[in-house]
């Protein structure tokens, strides 16, 4: 079904998800089992996101710092690393190098 570099047998929603005046743009990928992911890019900036469901952000390229809701600690992430974000929470992200990511909704 999937490999390290691609997703097979999926549908893609054509309309982009554009947030923060175009600083974050993603596309929704729908899987046959009903799950969904977004594939996106965040340009260098500082943003605050809210979540409904728990999320797993897999960094494909770029570099960022993240501070989860309730924490005072910033954690740096780069290509090949994942960020786990609880549901019904917020997080701050500072994108240092344009971030290419895959977000799974758990």
Curated annotation (Swiss-Prot):
Transmembrane segments: none annotated. Its EC number is 2.4.2.1, 2.4.2.2. It is an enzyme of class 2 (transferase). Keywords: Glycosyltransferase, Transferase. CDD domains: cupin_PpnP-like. GO terms for molecular function: guanosine phosphorylase activity; purine-nucleoside phosphorylase activity; thymidine phosphorylase activity; uridine phosphorylase activity. HAMAP family: Nucleos_phosphorylase_PpnP (MF_01537). Belongs to the nucleoside phosphorylase PpnP family. This is Pyrimidine/purine nucleoside phosphorylase. It comes from Burkholderia multivorans (strain ATCC 17616 / 249). The gene is ppnP.
